[in-house]
């Protein structure tokens, strides 16, 4: 196989060694087992989402994220996010990952409207490796209207 994609046999071997090779398949001891676990978890999530409604389901996810953040501490939580981003980048490839970021930016622009997006860009442009944009704006007396950051 000339592509970077692993064959089913190679993935099955990795799964048998304890590696998760299917997103959502954690705990499965073969490729097939991981596929079944992932499918079941996905269906279970959909059912729960239907029961709770969109807002309720989002709230449950938010609470779970907060609990995980508390368990791991700030650095651990950041590291987990970084690893997740790297894994997603690997899945999508460079162009796909850039496209995802572009779509996210466009969606955010739509949510905030032109003025809010522009104001957020001003703040982001002030940030450095040492200080956030908010800290720099405060130090330099630059007015940032964060009320514009709310969704339309």
Swiss-Prot record:
Region of interest called Disordered, as start-end residue ranges on this chain: 1-63, 116-152
Gene Ontology BP annotations: response to abscisic acid
Sequence repeats: 44-63, 64-83, 84-103, 104-123
Keywords: Repeat
GO terms for cellular component: cytosol
Compositionally biased tracts (Basic and acidic residues): 1-17, 32-63
Region (4 X 20 AA tandem repeats): 44-123
Induction: By abscisic acid (ABA).
One Pfam family in the UniProt entry: LEA_5
Tissues in which the UniProt entry reports expression: In seeds only. Specifically located to vascular bundles in the cotyledon and axis of the dry seed. Also found in the epiderm and outer layers of the cortex in the embryo axis.
Role description: It is thought to provide protection for the cytoplasm during the desiccation stage of embryo development.
Family membership noted in the UniProt record: Belongs to the small hydrophilic plant seed protein family.
Name under which the protein is recorded: Em-like protein GEA1
Naturally occurring in which organism (per UniProt): Arabidopsis thaliana (Mouse-ear cress)
UniProt gene name: EM1
């Amino acid at each position: 196989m000339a592509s970077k994609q692993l064959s089913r046999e190679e993935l099955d071997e990795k799964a048998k060694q304890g590696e998760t090779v299917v997103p959502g398949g954690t705990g499965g001891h073969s490729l097939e087992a991981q596929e079944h676990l992932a499918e079941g978890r996905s269906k279970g999530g959909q059912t729960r989402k239907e029961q709770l409604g969109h807002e309720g389901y989002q709230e449950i996810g938010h609470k779970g994220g907060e609990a995980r953040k508390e368990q791991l501490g700030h650095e651990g939580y950041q590291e987990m996010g970084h690893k997740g981003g790297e894994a997603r980048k690997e899945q999508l490839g460079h162009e796909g990952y850039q496209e995802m970021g572009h779509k996210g930016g466009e969606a955010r622009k739509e949510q905030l409207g032109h003025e809010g997006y522009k104001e957020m860009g001003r703040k982001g442009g002030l940030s450095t490796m040492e200080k956030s944009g908010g800290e720099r704006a405060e130090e330099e007396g630059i007015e940032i209207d964060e009320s514009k950051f709310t969704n339309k």
